[in-house]
Amino acid sequence: MAIYHLSVSNVSRASGSRATATLSYITGKRVHDERRGETYDYGRKERVLRVGTLLPEGAPAEFADPAVLFNAVELHETGRTARPAKKIVVALPREFTPRQRVQALEGYIRENLNADGYAATYAIHDDGQGNNPHAHILVANRQIDPKTGGWAKLKQRMEYVLDERGERVPLIDPKTGAQKLDKRGRRQWKRTSVSLNPLDRKAKLQSLRESWAKTCNARLDETARIDHRSLEDQGSDLEPTIHEGYAARAIERAGGVSERCQTNREIRRSNDLLTAIRHELGRIFDRLGELFAAKIGQLRQRQARPEAAREPNWRYFEGDARRQLEADRADHAAALRGRLMDARADVRNRETWWKNHGTEEFEAAKQIIDVACEASREARDAGMFQRGRLRRNAEQVAGEQSERLRGAVPWLEDTEIPADWDQANRFRMRTTKAIHDHDMQPRTGLVAELERQLEQAEQAAGERPSPEQVKDLALRMAEQRERAEGQARGANRPEPSGDEPLDLSEPEDWGESSPFEQRATPKTKADLLGELKQRADRRTGRQEAEQRQIDPWSAQPPQRRGHGR
């Protein structure tokens, strides 16, 4: 199974590392360091499967020899803390063939390193038995200028150190405890060296990690894809494994137990158990979802049955529904016509009002522009000796009045009053028309919108309602009728009491088991009928007595009233 691994480290002179020594280690070749006069030969050639060097555009041809390349960068970097190279280690998927390994690795180097001006040497390794395939990429830590073929400049710059509030940190004199001052008395601030090398930036390192995952996934099946993100970034709660390393695996191959390998085995068992639990929960939730969907389907079928049973009833209201829809559309169009007439009348009334009046903005703008026009008229009509002075005065007045106009009419776009009399008069006409149009725009806009709505309403009124609309309204009318009938039946139903009128007539045939026999009472049928008749007689007597109390004449025979002697 393919795994993801990519690590980047510095070849730092401060920690005793050398680019030439690292080159000898990854290539398994003998390398001479020209700067120090030392020769490195780490051997282990049996683990090295392939070595290659890829150069950017404009690089010298002799840099194709990795020993020449990294001796050159060692000689160019003279600082005691210099970092002449970077080392990138990537895990190669076991699913790759030897040719795919080379293609993926060289494509990755060209796209991410050579394209930015970096030269690099790679070496493909395994453990000597075909396991643990991986690659070392040694990158010269300075870009090559494509124009000159030499090393690029400006690797770093100085920047101020900032505190947590984003403010500069003062440089304190340890003797006095005060902030240091330079020779001119200026305060000193802490500064630090910031690398301008893209390989030292976090964004570039993230890009390298993501690009390696994409390069491998382009050649892997979907079931063997790798992900450059951490488990936390992926939103997974699985525990990540730790790096085992060559020494730990060597202990395991020798029959021992490595602490790192044992830790990873426990982590994998825990992750496998968690994955199995999650898979089982997913299967249970899927089954619950299927059952829920089935129940929803049954409920919908039950809800659809009353609609299907009511289908024949809506036909009775089909004609009424169609006429109602047509009437509603006609009423809507008529209402829009009335609103449109009112809106047009409002526009005419406002236009009439404008002939004799004006808004505050209108009057203010006229007064402001008239002042500028008067100054420009005086300049135009002035004599030869005063014309220059009055023209300058007209320009000054036009500028001042333009400022006043911007304050009086803030929404007006063109507020620059010309100093020329003819242009100022034309500006006056344009401005007053703009104020008039701005005041009328809500009313004319309402008229246009009502005209559009009326056109749509008249078009809809001229069309027949669709069958779906007719059926929907007819169904609602049928439902409303059924609810009204149900309420009427409930209102007319008498309340149950002991004095309900009884049907005393005996059915022609009770059948084998009459209602009286089903009660299993000891009384006979004749006894029960007698009791029921007595109960009815008592109730009839009570009703007659109540009637006599209300109207005493109702119980006596009617008497003739006349003028007898």
UniProtKB/Swiss-Prot annotation:
UniProt keyword rRNA-binding, yes or no: no
Regions crossing the membrane: none
Ranges of biased composition (kind: Basic and acidic residues): 524-549
Gene3D superfamilies assigned: 3.30.930.30
Keywords linked to the UniProt accession: Conjugation, Mobility protein, Plasmid
InterPro entries xref list: MobA_MobL
Compositionally biased residues, Acidic residues: 497-511
Region span, Disordered: 479-565
Described function: Might be involved in plasmid transfer.
Recorded family membership: Belongs to the MobA/MobL family.
Protein's UniProt name: Probable mobilization protein MobA
